[in-house]
Amino acid sequence: MSKLDLNALNELPKVDRVLALAETNAQLETLTAEERVAWALENLPGEYVLSSSFGIQAAVSLHLVNQIRPDIPVILTDTGYLFPETYQFIDELTDKLKLNLKVYRAGESPAWQEARYGKLWEQGVEGIEKYNEINKVEPMNRALKELKAQTWFAGLRREQSGSRAHLPVLAIQRGVFKVLPIIDWDNRTVYQYLQKHGLKYHPLWDQGYLSVGDTHTTRKWEPGMAEEETRFFGLKRECGLHEG
């Protein structure tokens, strides 16, 4: 696999970009997660960043990428509405893995947003999308720009939802390369990795949560529910960071 020209690929229509990356993706599918990270660091341009929501399985990608690229900036978009257990988990993992954590937030505080717009998450899909744009998308775009990112690692997996079922290992999103090293991992592989490296699931895993985001748009899993139904009242799966 040869080095890829980000500027040249960004000039192509989206469909042509996908086709241009198809051969590389076919080869990346045959590699291990660790090999994918190593390949990206050797063949894709820096600066490099890793994003994390510090969700249920976050320790996996944080450990995997950070051990190969120590001190890689780890981007967290903090809405101000995360669970107390999530903030504690962030502190625990940051200390344990010696993460180079970079926290980005909306320009308006949660209280100010509620004063201006009301509780956006109670205003249907349109309200949720506006909430995500303010609290997730804009801060992430700012992070990528300020950190001069050209290659972005994330811990998405196909098994998590229908919207992620066909994602490739390598794509271009928001004008940068996006690498998903554990995209093809199943729950068993995640569990085995955590066990092997002495890592933990998010604290709310033991309370029945399969996916964790903000307190007001996250539900415990109940029999018969798909994982994606535990977020955003089942109206949508993605918070906007991994769309587009």
UniProtKB/Swiss-Prot annotation:
Keyword field contains Nuclease: no
Keywords, ordered alphabetically: Cytoplasm, Oxidoreductase
Pfam families in the record: PAPS_reduct
Subcellular location: Cytoplasm
Transmembrane segments: none
Single GO MF annotation: phosphoadenylyl-sulfate reductase (thioredoxin) activity
SUPFAM superfamilies: Adenine nucleotide alpha hydrolases-like
GO cellular component, as recorded: cytoplasm
Superkingdom of the organism of origin: Bacteria
Catalytic activity field: [thioredoxin]-disulfide + sulfite + adenosine 3',5'-bisphosphate + 2 H(+) = [thioredoxin]-dithiol + 3'-phosphoadenylyl sulfate
Pathway: Sulfur metabolism; hydrogen sulfide biosynthesis; sulfite from sulfate: step 3/3
Active site residues of this protein: C239
E.C. code: 1.8.4.8
A biological-process GO annotation: hydrogen sulfide biosynthetic process
Matches recorded under InterPro entries: PAPS/APS_Rdtase (IPR004511), PAPS_reduct_dom (IPR002500), PAPS_reductase_CysH (IPR011800), Rossmann-like_a/b/a_fold (IPR014729)
Stated family: Belongs to the PAPS reductase family. CysH subfamily.
HAMAP family cross-referenced by the UniProt entry: CysH
Its job: Catalyzes the formation of sulfite from phosphoadenosine 5'-phosphosulfate (PAPS) using thioredoxin as an electron donor.
NCBIfam families: cysH, PAPS_reductase, PRK02090.1
UniProt protein name: Phosphoadenosine 5'-phosphosulfate reductase
Organism the protein comes from: Salmonella paratyphi B (strain ATCC BAA-1250 / SPB7)
Source lineage: Bacteria, Pseudomonadati, Pseudomonadota, Gammaproteobacteria, Enterobacterales
